[in-house]
Amino acid sequence: MLGSTGSVGRQTLDVVRAYPDRFRVVALAARGNIALLAEQAREFAPEIVAYTSDDPATQAQAADLLPHALHGVAGLTAAATHPAVQTLVAATSGLIGLRPTLAAIRAGKTIALANKETLVMAGHLVMAAAREAGVDILPVDSEHSALWQSLRGEHTAEVRRLLITASGGPLRKATLEEMRAVTVEQALAHPTWRMGQKITIDSATLMNKGLEVIEAHWLFDMPYDQIEVVVHPQSIIHSMVEFVDDSIKMQASLPSMHLPIQDALSYPARWNRAATALAHPLSWADVGHLDFEAVDMARFPCLRLAYEAGRRGGTAPAVLVGADEQAVPLFLAGKIRLTDIAEMLEETLARHTVIEDPTLEDVLAACSWAQDEALRLYGEPAAARERTSE
C-alpha cells in the first residue's frame, strides 16, 4: 500500500482488519507520518516499509523507529513491485505515486487506484500500460466505484452518459459574492466527508469533481460529452449510468470509503459485512428523500476548466494539477481568495503550450512548469498579468 497513513490508507487497513484471513500486508509506504507508519508496521509486519519525506527531522525519526525503512520514490517503487505483492493500493496524494504505480503495472500487479493525479496527468500512459500488461485498474474513489459497479455486465456502446454525483461541498448555496469572501474555515467545513485540507478545498471549488471527470474518461473510455456532474447533497447515490433505452443504474450506500475500498479488494466477489465492524446498512425510510441539482458553472469555474483541460488533452491536465497544487496552499495560508484559485488555473493554462502526445517526462515537466508559473502569477501585479495575456 502506498499512502498507508492517509485517510484512504487507514480505512484500507480497517478493511484488512475486518477480514484478517483474506489478506497479507506485504508493503507499507507513507510520506512523513513516521510514528503512525511504525505503529502500522508493528501491527501488520510487512516485508517492506518506505517513506518519502526529505525533512531532516522526519529522517532522524525514521532512523530511530524504522531503521530498515526504504526512502524516496525508489523505496515506493520497491514496495509496489515486491514479488509477493498481488494488489497495489495506490493511495498517495499528489504526484509521487505516479512512477511506482506505472512500475507496478509493468510488473503485473492489480491496481486498486485511489490517487487522482495518476490518471488525470498520465491517463494515456497508465491505461496503455495496463492494456499491454493485462492488468486491472480497479477504482477506489466512491464515484468511480459506483460507475464501475453499474457498468459491470453492460456494453459501453449502450451507455448514453455517466452521471457523477457531487455533494456540492460547503459552498453549495453560497452566492458568487459570498464565495469571494469565504474564509478558510468555511471552505474546510465539508458537510459529508472528512478529508485532508487540499482535497477538501478542491471539493469546495469542485476542482475535485473536475478531476473525477477526467479520471472517468480514462477508466471507462467515455467521451467528455457523455460525462456529466449533478449535485446530490445527501451523498447517498454515488454515481449513475444512463443507458440508451432511458434506464438508469446507480449505486447507493451511506457515505463511507470502506465500501468502495472493500469492493476493489474483494473483486470479483462481494463479501458479507454483517458480522464485521464495517457494517453500515442503508435504511431508505430514514433517508426519506433524495435531492438533485444542476451545477452552476459560473460559481464553480474550476469544473469548467477541468472539462476544458480534459478535452484539450496532452499536457493540459498536468498543468491544471500543477497550478492547483500551488493555488490551494496559497488560499489555505490566507494569501489569496478562494475565487482566485480558478483565475490562477485559467491564466496558467492560457500561458501553456500543450504537448499533444506527451511522455512521462513531458507530463512531469509540464506539471513542474505549472507550479512555477502559478507562483509567478501570484507574485505578479494584476496589470502585468493582463498585459501578458493580451
Question: Could you say what each language-model-derived stretch is?
Answer:
Residues 1-390:
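Catalytic, metal-anchored helix/loop core of enzyme active sites in primary metabolism
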